[in-house]
């Protein structure tokens, strides 16, 4: 079985492409079934394994398969599933085999590959991906071991380095951008669309600025109400957004919608109602919540996750010592995992040896039982049984010794001595 990771992320693809390759949560389980069975070979000697990690900044397919064409098949499947031409998608895709796939998983979970260096949200997202793959029956020995090691490495990196300290989060970056547009955030009305973890983080940072008003609009009213109450804000129905958008100076959106929920026309009407006072908008969703054409409006300042990434990277540069320490830990753990992976290659051989030896044992025991039932002497039957087992079990090794010559024979002799530690050496003059 070979490990392989196929994916795109914020390093290789813009948000305009990432949003087209993202998987809504409810699609991941059925997608895993088709990915495994159709493209990773259901007739392979070993059952293929797969997991899908889909976040704002990355979509990745983790695989364990015997299929030598898995790389091409995975890219083709991703292209066909999302109806994106292969020629358009392929230049942005990375394919990481074996140790590269292991190293990548360790770095992702540790926050080293994130837009926000050292952020912890990705670890939870990866655990969710593993849970979903497990529920779909898509994980097996190889990926289970990979992800368990991945979580252990992430814990070690975060516990022994300062990779997560003093990081500039996406939420903090959004506040910094707002401060460039408005002299005082405390004078502004802020609307949050959604009620997930990212919106909660943003609300925390903006609430610390003491805005004039804080409002939460969410598809599930109760959840939006609970979040608003935490920050002494108000909740409003999401359906009221088109008619009330003009009331807000700052709008931050991050929902799980597969289509934009804020269109160009609605924003144009809001700008007109505001008499062209500026609106600061942050779209943290992938796929995007706000139509990109909105950013072309004169009085609208629209930023996406990629835009905020530039501010985040400014804070990343100061923690390179922690990065080097984390990379060293990861490299050691990658080597450890690859050693485990190497041992897995002998498992089929060992299993076959056990099966063959057991078949020989059963055959001789059956023969002995028939002799005993016939009334033969038990001692003679046991002697014959033991002699037959001995002869059959050493037949393979002795035949191999007789077939090889030269250096191969010397190597095989040394190997056999390791198996049968009491075997006499070739220079033994005892005559035995």
Swiss-Prot record:
Short name of one Pfam family: GlutR_N
Q: Note the superkingdom of the native organism.
A: Bacteria
Q: Where does substrate bind?
A: 55-58, 114, 119-121, 125
Positions of the record's site feature: Important for activity = 104
Q: What is its EC number?
A: 1.2.1.70
**Reaction catalysed by this chain?**
(S)-4-amino-5-oxopentanoate + tRNA(Glu) + NADP(+) = L-glutamyl-tRNA(Glu) + NADPH + H(+)
Q: Does the keyword Oxidoreductase apply?
A: yes
Where's the active site on this chain? 56 (nucleophile)
**Which EC class heads this enzyme's classification?**
oxidoreductase
PROSITE patterns per the UniProt record, alphabetical: GLUTR
Keyword ATP-binding attributed: no
| Alphabetical keyword list | NADP, Oxidoreductase, Porphyrin biosynthesis
Q: Name one GO biological process term.
A: protoporphyrinogen IX biosynthetic process from glutamate
Task: Give GO terms: molecular function aspect only.
Answer: glutamyl-tRNA reductase activity; NADP binding
The UniProt annotation places NADP(+) binding at 194-199
What is the role of the protein in this entry? Catalyzes the NADPH-dependent reduction of glutamyl-tRNA(Glu) to glutamate 1-semialdehyde (GSA).
Subunit details? Homodimer.
> Regarding domains, what does the record say?
Possesses an unusual extended V-shaped dimeric structure with each monomer consisting of three distinct domains arranged along a curved 'spinal' alpha-helix. The N-terminal catalytic domain specifically recognizes the glutamate moiety of the substrate. The second domain is the NADPH-binding domain, and the third C-terminal domain is responsible for dimerization.
Q: What is the protein name for this chain? A: Glutamyl-tRNA reductase
């Amino acid at each position: 079985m070979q490990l392989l990771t196929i994916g795109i992320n914020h390093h290789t693809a813009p948000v305009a492409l990432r949003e087209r390759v993202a998987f809504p949560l409810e699609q991941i389980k059925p997608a895993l079934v088709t990915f495994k069975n159709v493209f990773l070979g259901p007739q392979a000697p070993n059952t293929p394994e797969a997991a899908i990690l889909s976040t704002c900044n990355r979509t990745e397919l983790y695989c364990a398969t015997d299929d030598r064409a898995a790389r091409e098949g995975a890219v083709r499947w991703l292209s066909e599933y999302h109806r994106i031409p292969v020629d358009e998608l392929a230049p942005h895709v990375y394919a990481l085999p074996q140790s590269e796939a292991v190293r990548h998983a360790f770095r992702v979970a540790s926050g080293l590959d994130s837009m926000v260096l050292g952020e912890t949200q990705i670890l939870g997202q990866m655990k969710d991906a593993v849970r979903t793959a497990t529920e779909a029956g898509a994980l097996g020995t190889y990926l289970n071991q990979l992800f368990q090691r991945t979580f252990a490495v992430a814990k070690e990196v975060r516990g022994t380095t300062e990779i997560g300290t003093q990081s500039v989060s996406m939420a903090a970056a959004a506040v910094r951008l707002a401060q460039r547009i408005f002299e005082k955030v405390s004078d502004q009305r802020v609307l949050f669309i959604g009620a997930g973890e990212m919106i909660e983080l943003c609300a925390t940072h903006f609430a610390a600025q003491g805005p004039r008003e804080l409002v939460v609009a969410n598809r599930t009213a109760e959840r939006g109400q609970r979040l608003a109450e935490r920050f002494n804000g108000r909740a409003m129905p999401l359906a009221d957004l088109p008619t009330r958008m003009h009331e807000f100076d700052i709008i931050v959106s991050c929902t799980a919608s597969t289509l934009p929920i804020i269109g160009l026309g609605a924003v144009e009407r809001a700008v007109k109602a505001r008499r062209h006072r500026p609106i600061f908008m942050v779209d943290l969703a992938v796929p995007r919540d706000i139509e990109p054409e909105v950013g072309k409006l004169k009085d609208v300042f629209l930023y996406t996750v990629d835009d905020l990434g530039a501010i985040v990277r400014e804070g990343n540069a100061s923690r390179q010592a922690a990065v080097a320490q984390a990379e060293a830990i990861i490299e050691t753990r990658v080597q450890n995992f690859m050693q485990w992976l190497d041992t897995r290659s002998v498992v089929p051989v060992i299993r076959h040896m056990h099966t063959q030896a057991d078949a020989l044992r059963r055959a001789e025991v059956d023969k002995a039982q028939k002799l005993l039932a016939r009334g033969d002497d038990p001692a003679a039957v046991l002697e014959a049984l033991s002699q037959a087992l001995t002869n059959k079990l050493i037949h393979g090794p002795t035949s191999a010794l007789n077939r090889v010559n030269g250096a191969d024979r010397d190597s095989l002799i040394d190997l056999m001595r390791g198996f049968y530690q009491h075997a006499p050496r070739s220079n033994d003059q005892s005559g035995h």
